[in-house]
From Swiss-Prot:
Organism: Rickettsia akari (strain Hartford)
Task performed by this protein: Specifically methylates guanosine-37 in various tRNAs.
Pfam families, A to Z: tRNA_m1G_MT (PF01746)
EC numbers for this chain: 2.1.1.228
Name of the protein: tRNA (guanine-N(1)-)-methyltransferase
Location (main, coarse): cytoplasm
One of the record's GO molecular function terms: tRNA (guanine(37)-N1)-methyltransferase activity
Amino acid sequence: MSILHATILTVFPEMFPGTLGDSLAGQALKKNIWSYDVINIRDFGLTKHKNVDDEAYGGGDGLIMRPDVLGNAIEHALSLNPNASIYYPSPRGRVFTQSFTKEMLKNKNLIFLCGRYEGIDERVIEEYNVEEISVGDYILSGGEIPTLAILDCLIRLLPGVLMNQNTLSSESFEEDGEFKGGLECSLYTRPKIWRGRAVPSVLLSGNHKLINEWKKEQSRMITKLRRPELLKDL
């Protein structure tokens, strides 16, 4: 079985693997369940200063990452990771969701282009059939943090990463899971009473039918309150 391999293009290579070198993702990296390489875009920069950006045609604030620089960096990435799907974290992109992760994993070879400054030249997106992907309706300083978040989400779905793969079915947003794409129910552990707050008695009853019904109703109520657009099947 092929492993997940990510090639990351960035002007800040020291940001990787970052949090992906720890916890579940870090253990999976050591087990060779996934792998990565990082390409410094500045290695393909122009002049002795290794410039990677320039002023925007048509005016406007901010600098744009140059297509000639990015093109050379992407060509190098494709030589290391052939047939890879290329993703560009961008607020203009398709919103990243749990169901999207399964679509992305159909190709285990991925390239992430981490933009900086005002963004990248549109011709790069057209030339390499780059898919823009958004992690939410807010603006970050660059694509590195979204790339880390997306990879973390992908890695934990790989076989052998979680000790109990069945836990995936009881998580929020899992359309085929226990909560049918809704939000996870409230969670409790020991002690039974903490600062006057008791664990719901149904969870202590040992009646699995009642417990499952309670969990589903909790999920429905929480989803209705916080994310009503997810209620289609609840």
